[in-house]
C-alpha cells in the first residue's frame, strides 16, 4: 500500500535541521504484514531524543530509514498467526521482545538480543523490511529498500510491525496518552520503579527534565515519593514544581545545597549529567543512568566513594521494562488520575514540521512534540 512517511536520508547533518533537511517527507510502499505481524494505522507519534540521536549521528543507524519509535495506533490488518484483532488500539514499543533468549529471561534487566540485533540492522524482528520507495540512481529508475527504525517507523500514516513490538490498550486510553506510554513513560517510569526501586518514603531525584526525565518525575510523584527535579532550563524547573516536585533547581545549586537522595535518575544523556546524578546520590543509594550519551562520552567519578559509601550505579535501557507487564500498571495510574501525562506534551505538529521540531528538541526547549495523523 502507498503511505506517506518521514525518511532520514543522512546522519550527522548540520544544524539547523530546518535548513539542512536531513529528513524528507514523501510516498513509500508498505508491504502487507507477514506471519506474526500487524498493519497499524498511526494515530499519534512522539518525537523523542532517541530520534534526534540518530539524526545528529550520536547513534548511527543505516539509512535511508523511516524514523519514529514512540506511537499509538489501531490495527487494520493482521498477518498469519497474529493474535491481535482488527480495531485494537496498541502502544508501539521500540524494543521487540522475543521471549525466548537469555536476555529476555532477565525480566527486563537486559534488552532482548534478537530485538536488539533487528533494531541495529534496521529490520523487523522476524527479519526483512516491509518498506521501499521509488529510486532514481543516476537517472535510472528503480526501487530502494528503506530501513525500519527500532522495529516501529512511526513517522508515517501506517506501519507494519511485529506483534512483539506492540501492547494492546483499552479504547478509553486516548492515543496521545497511549503514545507516551511506549517510550517516555516506559523508560522514565521504569528507571524509577524497575531499576531504582525506592523504598516507601525514599526521596527520588531526577537529573534532566526532558520527556523521559519528566515522566520519571511524574511516576515517582504518583507513587508518593518526595522528588527533586534538576535541570538547567528554568521553564522546565517551573513545570516540575507544578507537577509535584518538592524542589526544582539547577545542577550546580543542587550540588551546592547537598540535595542528596537514595535514588537518583540521570535522564539527560550526557556525561556531565551523570556526574551530577552521582554527586547527588546518598550513601548506600543508587544512581540510575537511563540517558544515551555519545559513544565517546566519558565521565569521572570517585571509585573510593563508590566503595566506602556502598553506592550502586545501574544502567537501565528502556527503563528495564517488560512492556506487556509495565504498560498496564501505568494505565491504571493514569485512570486513577495520578499520572497526568498530558503535561508532557509541549507541541502538536504535522510530519512536514519535523525539521523545525528537531531543532526545538536539540535546543532543549521541548518536552514531547506529538505528530498528529
Predicted regions located by residue number:
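Short N-terminal strand-loop motif that marks the start
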Residues: 1-72, 153, 157-161
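Glycine-rich beta-strand-centered segment in the early N-terminal region that forms part
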Residues: 31-45, 56-105, 110, 118, ...
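Glycine-rich phosphate-binding loop and adjacent beta-alpha segment
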Residues: 271-338, 373
Amino acid at each position: 500500500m502507498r503511505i506517506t512517511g518521514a525518511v532520514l536520508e543522512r546522519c550527522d547533518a548540520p544544524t539547523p535541521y530546518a535548513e539542512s533537511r536531513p529528513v524528507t517527507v514523501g510516498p513509500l510502499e508498505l508491504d502487507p504484514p507477514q506471519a506474526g505481524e500487524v498493519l497499524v494505522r498511526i494515530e499519534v507519534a512522539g518525537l523523542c531524543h532517541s530520534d534526534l540521536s540518530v539524526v545528529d549521528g550520536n547513534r548511527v543507524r543505516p539509512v535511508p530509514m523511516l524514523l519514529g519509535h514512540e506511537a499509538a495506533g489501531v490495527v487494520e490488518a493482521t498477518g498469519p498467526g497474529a493474535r491481535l484483532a482488527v480495531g485494537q488500539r496498541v502502544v508501539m514499543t521500540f524494543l521487540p521482545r522475543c521471549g525466548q533468549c537469555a536476555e529476555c529471561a532477565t525480566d527486563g534487566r537486559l534488552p532482548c538480543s534478537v530485538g536488539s540485533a533487528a533494531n541495529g540492522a534496521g529490520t523487523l524482528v522476524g527479519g526483512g523490511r516491509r518498506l521501499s520507495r521509488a529510486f532514481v540512481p543516476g537517472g535510472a529508475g528503480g526501487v530502494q529498500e528503506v530501513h525500519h527504525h527500532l522495529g516501529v517507523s512511526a513517522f508515517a500514516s501506517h506501519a507494519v510491525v511485529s506483534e512483539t513490538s506492540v501492547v494492546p490498550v483499552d479504547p478509553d486510553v486516548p492515543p496521545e496518552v497511549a503514545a507516551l506510554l511506549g517510550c517516555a513513560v516506559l523508560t522514565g517510569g521504569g528507571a524509577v520503579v524497575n531499576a531504582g526501586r525506592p523504598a516507601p518514603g525514599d526521596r527520588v531525584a531526577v537529573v534532566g527534565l526532558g520527556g523521559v526525565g519528566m515522566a520519571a518525575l511524574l511516576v515517582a510523584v504518583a507513587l508518593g515519593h518526595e522528588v527533586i527535579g534538576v535541570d538547567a532550563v528554568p521553564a522546565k524547573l517551573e513545570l516540575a514544581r507544578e507537577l509535584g516536585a518538592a524542589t526544582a533547581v539547577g545542577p550546580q545549586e543542587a550540588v551546592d545545597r547537598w540535595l542528596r537522595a537514595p535514588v537518583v535518575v540521570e535522564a539527560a544523556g550526557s556525561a556531565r549529567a551523570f556526574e551530577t546524578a552521582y554527586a547527588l546520590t546518598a550513601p548506600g543509594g543508587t544512581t540510575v543512568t537511563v540517558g544515551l550519551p555519545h559513544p565517546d562520552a566519558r565521565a569521572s567519578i570517585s571509585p573510593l566513594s563508590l566503595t566506602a559509601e556502598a553506592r550502586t550505579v545501574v544502567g537501565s535501557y528502556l527503563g528495564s521494562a517488560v512492556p506487556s507487564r509495565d504498560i498496564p500498571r501505568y494505565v491504571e495510574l493514569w485512570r486513577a488520575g495520578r499520572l497526568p501525562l498530558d503535561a508532557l506534551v509541549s507541541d502538536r505538529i504535522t510530519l512536514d514540521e519535523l525539521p523545525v521540531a528537531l531543532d526545538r528538541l536539540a535546543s532543549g526547549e521541548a518536552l514531547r512534540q506529538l505528530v498528529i495523523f
